[in-house]
Each structure stands twice: as C-alpha cells, then as structure tokens.
UniProtKB/Swiss-Prot annotation:
GO molecular function: rRNA binding; structural constituent of ribosome
InterPro entries (UniProt xref): Ribosomal_uS11, Ribosomal_uS11_bac-type, Ribosomal_uS11_sf
Organism this protein belongs to: Wolinella succinogenes (strain ATCC 29543 / DSM 1740 / CCUG 13145 / JCM 31913 / LMG 7466 / NCTC 11488 / FDC 602W) (Vibrio succinogenes)
Identification of the protein by name: Small ribosomal subunit protein uS11
Pfam families named among the record's database cross-references: Ribosomal_S11
Claim: Glycosyltransferase is one of the keywords in the record: no
Amino acid sequence: MAKRKVTNKKRVVKKNIARGIIHIAATFNNTSVTITDEMGNVICWSTAGALGFKGSKKSTPYAAQQAVEDAVVKAKEHGIKELGIKVQGPGSGRETAVKSLGSIEGIKVLWFKDVTPLPHNGCRPPKRRRV
C-alpha cells in the first residue's frame, strides 16, 4: 500500500489591526480591492472576477461594490475599524466602490486619495476607437 502524502496547510493568522488602507484598482475590465495595514502588508483582497462575475459583468459598478463589501468583511475579522482609501484607474466601479464604503457599519473612513498615474507626455496612447 502506498504511503499518504502529508501536506501542511497554511493557516490564516488572525491579526489585530485597527487601521488600514483600502486600495481600489478600477480598470476597464475588472475591479480589484486590496486591504493593507499602514506599512503596506496585505491583509485581504477581493476582485469582481473572484466573486464569480464573468466577462463584461466584471466591469460593472455592482461588481465593484460587491468586491469592496467582500474585502471589508474579511478585514473586519482581523479587527479593522478605520480605513484610508486609495483609488486608481479609470474604471466604471470607482464611485460605487467608494460610496459603498460609507454605508458599511463599523468602518470609519479617514481619508481619500486618487493615485491614478498621469503621464507627463510619455508614451503615445493607443488609437481612438471608432464605433
């Protein structure tokens, strides 16, 4: 009889962190939400695609709202009570994601910052779409 492989499962260590930063990256195709502590260490994350939204539904404002709510529920397990918000990208889920943070109980928003990178006339942009 063959021996069984013994695998060590990674345990999720519950941290007790009161303050954090939520990074919302809203692209044209998806919305990614990452919650870190103030040093930048990742506590939890969520994306619209990971929640089961497929194709063009990932880029909707509703999918962005669900991704934020899922990430905040995970962060509350680690003791997060106060969040700063960093938003990046031109996606359609930006405003909805930020508004949904204000309606979640037990979370206080400390500050808001838009960190979308803007070129100082760098690379040439892609050609305009003609629909």
